[in-house]
């Protein structure tokens, strides 16, 4: 039986609620404990997944689940008109899938992280109570641990949110050939990777807000007598509210299979203390070096003090970190096929400056990569560091540039150096690429100098995950810069060893772990069809309010697909194709004496009402939507292109053909 995504998600939700209600986690835990303890030869023979499933069946757990699970006739309760009237935000809130699943392997140690509710989210007291049936704001918890990512289902925002989720995290070894071996207590104690928990709030319009970014040190469970421990994680706010409590999550940690010998609490505490001391000493030494390096940079030329040389930046938790630590070599696997497609993906993540209370200068906040991906929006620094990380993953010599753009506005972008000496600038907000052509200040005045086509004015420094270089040329104007990084008279470099000591995860255990990219949860064809139905409904209702009838031309709508596909390919690859075929097809579809008009527009979201309201602000689109004349035929086509991390490029084209009435 094939179900639509909405019905499938509704079915999953019913099953999930039923399992929570009957405390399936507790029953499975009891059966596992009884099976392990009751097996007389468990020390010589490890419990397999098949044995455990047989144990569940023998104790009737599976039968109990199926016996108490009842389904009502939910499939006939929604009509097509109802689905058209729903907002796109409502559909997106339901379209939640677990990003990564794991099975209990007989040779792998697992950490079961269970969230059993929250409390003291006092800011939610200011939120009005939603009306029955009204879409409300939701919390979503994202979890990252050692290259594994999960997210919870959306939970209605409340002072005491009912977050009931379990995440099975695999504790694997790093060494080659060791991944299949069971990690013992000593090995796990040396694994200092925290569990990164990011709490996101999504409002009724689909806008996301970062509530908290929390790093959980899970190793306290290694000293628990029975391999179980309950903890309360106090979440703090972000940015200016980094020291203000945002709420508390109640957590349960449990190891599978349990340890035969637990560690002493003093041993775990001592290990954490030694790691903190080691990290603090490295950071102190780097700070001393950075101060000395900065003074040497100022001694070269007093005017260097005014250049934008960014050595440290604050993250969402108010922690000062070297800027090089925000860049990683990030490989996207099969999710992105080329550097230009990576640039397109980054440009689809929305722009948003860090929120600030009150007026004044711009609040600068560099988000860790996990936070940026979960929130799906950020400032120029977040976009630039992510794009640089992806370009490094594709094997390019990429750097983040810190400087200014037009009107002397501070800005961050990306630069790549070709093997032939060419320099290319990448604008992470738009995915535009600019070839750098420097101006020769010593050239005779009669020689025509190249005019810059990029929007960048000055450049203070460049960096990636290994290298930090400050611009010590006489002028920091971008068009005059010579990018010969081996020339010490033009670029002052930091010691690569010093940078590595605080920016390499292998040397500094306090750095946030680098998350993998996750595939899109969107089904492009279904999302396109749904959004197109909603746009047709909104356009028809708008014309009805104006006293105009609406007659659709389905063939003309279909022809618009070719243009939308070409637009997205041009954004990705920088080349256009198929325009001649599209124009020829339109000419054949429009009779003599008729006029054809079309209006394409690009969005980063699937909210039909927001998109339609934006389109009506354009006089060209309004002219098409409100078209009057003889034999008026309307067409609308929607194409949704899915990208990693739920990013999407939504292309909408409105068109009409009519015979003018003079």
UniProtKB/Swiss-Prot annotation:
GO cellular component, as recorded: centriole; centrosome; cytoplasm
GO biological process: regulation of centriole replication
Keyword set includes Cytoplasm: yes
Keywords, in A-Z order: Cytoplasm, Cytoskeleton
Superkingdom assignment: Eukaryota
Subcellular location field: Cytoplasm, Cytoskeleton, Microtubule organizing center, Centrosome; Cytoplasm, Cytoskeleton, Microtubule organizing center, Centrosome, Centriole
Disulphides: none
Transmembrane parts of this sequence: none
UniProt cross-references to SUPFAM superfamilies, sorted A to Z: Cysteine proteinases (SSF54001)
Annotated coiled-coil segments of the chain: none
Keyword Cytoplasm in annotation: yes
Predominant cellular place of this UniProt entry's protein: cytoplasm
Family indicated by similarity: Belongs to the CEP76 family.
PANTHER family reported in the protein's UniProt record: CENTROSOMAL PROTEIN OF 76 KDA
Purpose: Centrosomal protein involved in regulation of centriole duplication. Required to limit centriole duplication to once per cell cycle by preventing centriole reduplication.
Protein name: Centrosomal protein of 76 kDa
């Amino acid at each position: 039986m094939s179900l639509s995504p909405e019905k499938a998600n509704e079915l999953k939700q019913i099953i999930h609620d039923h399992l929570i209600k009957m405390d399936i986690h507790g029953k499975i835990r009891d059966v596992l404990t009884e099976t392990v303890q009751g097996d007389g030869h468990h020390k010589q023979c490890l419990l397999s997944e098949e044995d455990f499933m047989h144990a569940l069946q023998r104790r009737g757990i599976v039968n109990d689940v199926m016996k108490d699970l009842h389904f009502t006739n939910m499939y006939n309760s929604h009509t097509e008109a109802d689905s058209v009237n729903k907002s796109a935000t409502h559909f997106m809130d339901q379209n939640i899938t677990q990003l990564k699943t794991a099975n209990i392997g007989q040779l792998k140690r697992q950490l079961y992280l269970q969230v059993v509710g929250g409390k003291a989210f006092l800011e939610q007291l200011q939120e009005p109570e939603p009306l029955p049936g009204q879409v409300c704001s939701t919390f979503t918890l994202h979890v990252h641990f050692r290259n594994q990512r999960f997210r919870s289902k959306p939970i209605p925002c409340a002072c005491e949110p009912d977050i009931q989720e379990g995440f099975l995290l695999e504790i694997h070894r790093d060494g080659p050939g060791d991944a299949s071996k069971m990690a013992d207590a000593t090995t796990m104690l040396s694994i200092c990777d925290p569990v990164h928990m990011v709490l996101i709030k999504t409002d009724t319009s689909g806008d996301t807000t970062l509530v908290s970014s929390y790093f959980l040190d899970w190793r306290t469970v290694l000293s628990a007598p029975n391999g179980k421990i309950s903890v309360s994680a106090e979440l703090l706010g972000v940015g200016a509210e980094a020291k203000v409590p945002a709420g508390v999550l109640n957590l349960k940690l449990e190891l599978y299979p349990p340890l035969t010998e637990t560690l002493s609490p003093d041993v775990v505490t001592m290990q954490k203390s030694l790691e903190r001391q080691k990290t603090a000493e490295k950071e102190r030494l780097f700070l001393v070096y950075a101060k000395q390096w900065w003074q040497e940079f100022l001694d070269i030329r007093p005017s260097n003090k005014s250049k934008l040389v960014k050595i440290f930046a604050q993250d969402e938790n108010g922690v000062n970190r070297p800027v090089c630590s925000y860049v990683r070599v990030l490989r996207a696997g099969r999710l992105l096929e080329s550097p230009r497609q990576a640039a397109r993906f980054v440009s689809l993540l929305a722009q948003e400056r860090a929120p600030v209370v009150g007026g004044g200068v711009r609040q600068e906040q560099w988000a860790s990569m996990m936070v940026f991906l979960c929130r799906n929006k950020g400032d120029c620094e977040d976009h630039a560091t992510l794009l640089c990380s992806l370009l490094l993953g594709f094997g390019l010599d990429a750097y983040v540039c810190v400087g200014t753009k037009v009107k002397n506005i501070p800005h961050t972008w990306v630069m790549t150096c070709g093997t032939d000496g060419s320099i290319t600038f990448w604008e992470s907000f738009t995915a535009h690429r600019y070839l750098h052509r420097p101006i020769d200040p010593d050239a005779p005045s009669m020689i025509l100098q190249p005019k810059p086509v990029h929007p960048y004015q000055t450049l203070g420094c460049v960096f990636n995950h290994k290298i930090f270089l400050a611009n010590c040329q006489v002028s920091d104007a971008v068009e005059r810069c010579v990018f010969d990084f081996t020339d010490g008279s033009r670029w002052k470099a930091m010691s690569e060893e010093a940078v590595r000591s605080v920016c390499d995860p292998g040397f500094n255990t306090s750095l946030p772990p680098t998350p993998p990219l996750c595939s899109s949860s969107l089904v492009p064809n279904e999302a396109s069809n749904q959004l197109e139905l909603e746009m047709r409904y909104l356009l028809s209702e708008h014309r009805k309010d104006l006293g105009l009838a609406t007659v659709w031309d389905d063939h003309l709508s279909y022809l618009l697909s070719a243009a939308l596909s070409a637009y997205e390919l041009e954004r990705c690859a920088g080349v256009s194709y198929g325009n001649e075929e599209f124009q020829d097809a339109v000419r054949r579809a429009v009779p003599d004496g008729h006029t054809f008009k079309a209006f394409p527009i690009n969005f980063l979201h699937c909210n039909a009402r927001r998109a339609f309201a934006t389109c009506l602000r354009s006089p060209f689109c309004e002219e098409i939507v409100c078209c009057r004349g003889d034999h008026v035929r309307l067409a609308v086509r929607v194409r949704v292109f899915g990208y990693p991390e739920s990013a999407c490029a939504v292309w909408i084209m409105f068109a009409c053909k009519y015979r003018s009435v003079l």
